[in-house]
Amino acid sequence: MDVTDADVAEVGEDIDAVLDALSATVIADRELLETVLLGVLARGHILLEDIPGTGKTLIARSVARTLGLSFSRVQFTPDLLPADVTGTHVYNEGAGEFEFSPGPVFANVVLADEINRAPPKTQAALLETMEERQVTADGETHDLPEPFFVLATQNPVEMAGTFELPEAQVDRFLVKTAIGYPDGAGETELLRRRAGRDRQSPTAEEVLSAAAVRALQGVPESVRVEEDLLEYLVTLSRATRERSECDVGVSPRGTQRFFEATRVRAVLSGREYVTPEDVKRVARPVLAHRLVLTPDAAVEGVDKRSVIDDVLDEVPVPTV
């Protein structure tokens, strides 16, 4: 199926309605909210690195509510076990047999809060479900609901009590980004909204349904990407592998995720084709976290995002 202007226009109306509903609930940059929706439509997952208290839980809960999806939150701690996330078999006395009791990962939107406070084995259990979209327990396989989207948060690695995520696991996230502090006007609006209600947390309006979200996820699959832009994507990824600051550049899997993100970005921009501007807008959040700096570059404080910026400046942009 080819994507038509009408398809994109209809999707654009749905996306605008979702963003408006989120903006009425969450004090956050619209670009950030679009990035979260990009993850949902691309069937990817998002890693937010931020300090506590910046609204990560509210954003995740509001996204689930607005999209008509189920939501669960897992607080990662040093004593959290893999079964606490995925579920386990418990004995049913009435039936006289063991039955699988699903864990909190069985939801459409899962907030994995402070994922780097849990030990590596528990981190791996979640990341495996992200990749496979299913849970295997005692030889039985249980499919996760569709759509399935993980929004994981982590504290900056310099904070105490954290276990840094291995590079191979970070690579499984479509996007890594941050919320950051709101500006002065935003923080004032936060207090104004709090003063106007008797509950601590606001509730977002439901705009779509799970079935509608699944339909939206299919639209980017037919967005056109010209041959010159395919070569541009590959050239950008390969250029990261040749940078002197990097021990490891973007993997082939990362290049595929890059491609998928550009198509969703085109849909969010109301187009049925990808442009170089789409590529540039998603390059930082999709590629930077996939780089592994050399020890010297890490000591010098090289910013991975600046490496991506340099690559974008150096690689010729195709004319399409």
Describe each PLM feature range.
Residues 8-46, 51:
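Pre-Walker A (pre-P-loop) alpha-helix and adjacent loop at the N terminus of AAA/AAA+ ATPase modules
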Residues 8-12, 25, 162, 179-250, ...:
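Conserved C-terminal "switch" segment of AAA+ ATPases
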Residues 51, 85, 153:
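P-loop (Walker A) phosphate-binding loop of NTP-binding proteins
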Residues 50, 113-114, 125:
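Walker B catalytic acidic pair
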Residues 40-78, 82, 91:
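Walker A/P-loop
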Residues 92-95, 118, 132-207, 215-221, ...:
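Canonical AAA+ ATPase core
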Residues 1-3, 58-61, 242-320:
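C-terminal engagement/docking regions of AAA+ P-loop ATPases
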Residues 37, 91-111, 140:
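Conserved alpha-helical scaffold flanking the Walker A/P-loop in AAA+ ATPase domains
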